[in-house]
Amino acid sequence: MYIEITSVCNLACSFCPPTSRAKNILKLDALNKTLDQIRPHTKYIYLHVKGEPLLHPRVDQLLEASHAKGFRVNITTNGTLINKNRHKLLGKPALRQINFSLHSFDGHEGSENREKYLGDILDFVREAKEHNIIISFRLWNLQREQVSEIAQRRNRETLEILEKEYNLDYKIEEKVQPGKGIKIAHNIYLNQDHEFQWPSLLAPEDDGKGFCHALRNQAAILVDGT
């Protein structure tokens, strides 16, 4: 179950369509009400849909409320605010997994200093290991056509930093497959995939075969309750 805790984001990534919805954050009492409603159906929740969850000023209280009602929490973040929020995340027993969308660095036109961006994330991950938090690094920026030389170089720079951090004796590209993750350390994974395309009623009709998990084994509740 996905629960959007804010519709606001601090980046403007090329792969993420802008929202026309009003800026909003989820109040604690609204989360508690939602958790009571979904409790018979799941014990795992994802505190994100659109927006950057670490912009929520009381994300620590949301985690505490989730734990009080017996839920395990996964969070997906662009990672830019991890230093500011580390004290709100570490030591929270509800927090099961954090996914870092590393492709957001190159997806946002104004990004600067890749080394510091990744360094802050890796510094957090080192401490998160002591709390048995699962970490997933995501690079969902592969193109189905020929990848540009610039995109290849940018990805290689990111992967080199990860290879050095975890003392890997291989290049990650040699083992990773689109849509499948690889384990690079205890509780630490890397997932590389094609760029995610957000569904749109304005997009060209796709006659290909596919399968949608929505409302079968997953659902999302937006910050306004819809």
Regions found by a protein language model. Name each.
Residues R39, R86-G107, I150-I182:
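Structural recognition of alpha->loop->beta junctions
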Residues D120-E130, G208-C212:
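A structural motif corresponding to the C-terminal lobe/cap of the Radical SAM core domain
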Residues V73, F105-G107, F124-N155:
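Conserved strand-turn element in the central/C-terminal portion of the radical SAM core barrel
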Residues F105-E112, P199-P204:
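Surface-exposed cleft-lining segments at the edges of enzyme active sites
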Residues N74-T76, N99, I134-L139, K171, ...:
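A structural signal for short, well-ordered beta-strand segments and their strand-loop junctions
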Residues Y2, P178-T226:
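Accessory C-terminal segments flanking Radical SAM cores
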Residues L54, W140, E165, D169-K171, ...:
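Class I S-adenosyl-L-methionine
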